[in-house]
């Protein structure tokens, strides 16, 4: 049986560029991660594809999955649910493959409670002024929503201590390489590999 894969969790405040960084990681030739697509009740944006960017579901469908215990994590953010379906994640980890989650900060806390040996990475902006500029630059939100997102972002940055690593997204290629380096080093941690060597000794 193969070793269980790593659960890699990337999160950070709205507008920090989580989706852009994640897409750059998965577009690279040496990518070997499995992406767990999040589910949301928010409105589908122009250019987004159901089942590729998110699973877009109604509030009623999402709440039924919560009730059935079918979510690894979920959170309500600016009036919409976001979450991670459980079945795919467990099946993929059991196959020895690394699973990459891009989720909200509230959801990451739930995952850490359930999977404490995951790799938790917090993506940060260079500063809050840059973060606000990125959110405004999307052109998808009204000013009242932008201000609400900024207030939530401040609270989320204060939760950085819950994570294992902080990566500044000043330039996407640099942020991508930092994340890849973190994950590569995690595979060599003694507490992750020692079980294999103990088993080898027992079989000698």
From Swiss-Prot:
One Pfam entry for this protein is Guanylate_kin
Similarity comment: Belongs to the guanylate kinase family.
Q: Where is the Guanylate kinase-like domain?
A: 5-184
Q: Output this protein's name.
A: Guanylate kinase
Residues binding ATP, per UniProt = 12-19
Q: Which CDD domains does the record cross-reference, listed alphabetically?
A: GMPK (cd00071)
What role is this protein assigned?
A: Essential for recycling GMP and indirectly, cGMP.
GO MF term list:
ATP binding; guanylate kinase activity
Per UniProt, what is the name of the gene that codes for the protein in this document?
Answer: gmk
Organism of origin is Enterococcus faecalis (strain ATCC 700802 / V583)
What HAMAP family does its record include?
Answer: Guanylate_kinase
EC number, as in UniProt: 2.7.4.8
Catalyses which reaction?
GMP + ATP = GDP + ADP
Q: Does the keyword Nucleotide-binding apply?
A: yes
Keyword hit for rRNA-binding: no
Q: Which UniProt keywords apply?
A: ATP-binding, Cytoplasm, Kinase, Nucleotide-binding, Transferase
Location(s), subcellular: Cytoplasm
Q: Which GO terms describe its cellular component?
A: cytosol
């Amino acid at each position: 049986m193969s070793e269980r894969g790593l659960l890699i969790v990337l999160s950070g405040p709205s507008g920090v560029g989580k989706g852009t960084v994640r897409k750059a990681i998965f577009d690279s030739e040496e990518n070997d991660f499995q992406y767990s697509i999040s589910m949301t009740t928010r409105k589908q944006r122009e250019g987004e594809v159901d089942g590729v960017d998110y699973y877009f579901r109604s509030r009623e469908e999402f709440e039924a999955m919560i009730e059935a215990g079918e979510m690894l994590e979920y959170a309500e953010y600016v009036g919409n649910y976001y979450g991670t379906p459980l079945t795919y994640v467990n099946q993929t980890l059991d196959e020895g493959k690394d699973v990459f989650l891009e989720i909200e900060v509230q959801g990451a806390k739930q995952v850490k409670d359930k999977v404490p040996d995951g790799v938790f990475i917090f993506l940060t902006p260079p500063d809050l002024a840059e973060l606000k500029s990125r959110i405004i630059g999307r052109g998808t939100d009204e000013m009242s929503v932008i201000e609400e997102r900024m207030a939530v972002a401040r609270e989320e940055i204060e939760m950085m201590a819950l994570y294992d690593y902080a990566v500044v997204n000043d330039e996407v290629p640099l942020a991508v390489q930092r994340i890849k380096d973190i994950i590569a080093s995690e595979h060599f941690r003694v507490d992750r590999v020692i079980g294999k060597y103990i088993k080898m000794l027992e079989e000698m």
